Design a protein with these regions (language model features):
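Terminal, compositionally biased segments used for targeting/anchoring and flexible tails
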Residues: 5-16, 20-27, 39-41, 60-68, ...
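Glycine-rich, acidic and aromatic/proline-enriched surface loops and short helix-turn segments
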Residues: 44
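Zn2+-dependent metallopeptidase catalytic domains
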Residues: 50-51
Length: 327
């Protein structure tokens, strides 16, 4: 990260010039899923607030640019807990060392295949070296994962959260949340009354079809139209309707997307393969801790007669953020 970036701080609203957006969105590791689940659980229980998390993240200084997204959240959560007196550094260090020890698995000296005497019957065969050696090519957990485990264990011991809270949240992000937005859009495509309700009062409309969003933030639905293209960003951090769409993609959290989409949205959309005519208006909607957006894409013309289940299968996350449109 350049000194220019550090000087500008973590929230650069429209200050970057055409830095290409990395569209790759790698699958989250277990460590990342656990860290994310812990953060969501403690904020949903009001043990901490998103404003506190953001404040402490901004206070990280140059370290903000030197560590990753989940590590920043973990470090900020730890600092909040210390400041609030939830635990002290001595207890944290003790529990952290215990967690590190739990991953300290001794290496086993396996036999040399050339010295093995075969006592079993069968067709003559040989063993490959890989049959007798451990696979040590995999990477262990990153350092911040030990911090995450320590924070979680302390909070569990204090009765603030449970193990089940975390495992349930991981499962929801894997299997529940990513499908909710698809369900909502499919119903809006098939039910004009619901579509109007969704546009007028999205949060209540979604609640009325049995989806509990588990968020304090309001939801605003913006329908794409022939005259206007809508796209969503969070210039401040990474606010996103997680309980409706799942985790935000990596590019959504990236500095290049957050800064560029504000002042050159047409170029950004082109990088996603979405070409918006010059005579069509583009509206960029900035999410925050109190307000999240859902973009309602146009229904494909070749789907007449489809039911909601069929429609939900063709709804993609990128449509609901506004970076892409259905064919």
């Amino acid at each position: 990260m350049s000194q220019k970036h550090k000087k500008m701080g973590p929230h650069d609203v429209g200050g970057e010039n055409s830095i290409p957006i990395d569209l790759n969105d790698p699958e989250m590791t277990h460590w990342e899923k656990y860290a994310n689940a812990l953060r969501i659980v403690v904020s949903s229980k009001r043990i901490i607030t998103l404003d506190e998390l953001r404040y402490h993240t901004e206070k990280l200084g140059d370290a903000y640019f030197e560590i990753g997204y989940f590590e920043r959240n973990c470090l900020s959560l730890h600092n909040i807990c210390i400041n609030k007196g939830i635990y002290n550094e001595e207890l944290f260090s003790k529990v952290r060392l215990k967690k590190i020890a739990e991953f300290d698995v001794p290496k086993i000296n396996l036999p040399d295949p050339n010295t093995i005497e075969h006592l079993h019957d069968g067709v003559p065969h040989s063993h490959e070296v890989s049959d007798f050696q451990e696979d040590e090519t995999g990477e262990g957990p990153p350092d911040y994962y030990y911090d995450t485990l320590a924070i979680a264990e302390i909070m569990i011991e204090l009765g603030l959260i449970t193990k089940e809270d975390i495992t349930q949240k991981i499962d929801q992000f894997d299997n529940v949340f990513p499908n909710r937005g698809k369900t909502v859009v499919a119903k809006a495509w098939n039910d004009e009354d619901f579509r109007q309700y969704l546009i007028e009062d999205a949060k209540n409309a979604i609640s009325n079809i049995g989806i509990k969003l588990e968020t304090f933030a309001d939801i605003i639905c913006m329908p794409q139209s022939p005259e206007t293209h809508h796209i969503v960003v969070c210039t401040l951090c990474s606010c996103y309707p997680r309980t409706l769409l799942g985790m935000p993609p990596s590019w959504y959290k990236s500095r290049s997307y957050r800064s560029r989409v504000v002042h050159e949205p047409r170029k950004v959309l082109a990088e996603f393969g979405t070409i918006v005519p010059e005579n069509k208006e583009i509206k960029v909607h900035d999410s925050n801790a109190d307000m999240r957006y859902l973009i309602l894409p146009p229904r494909p013309s070749n789907t007449n007669g489809w039911n909601e289940e069929q429609l939900s299968e063709i709804v993609e996350r990128d449509y609901l953020v506004g970076v892409r449109l259905p064919d």
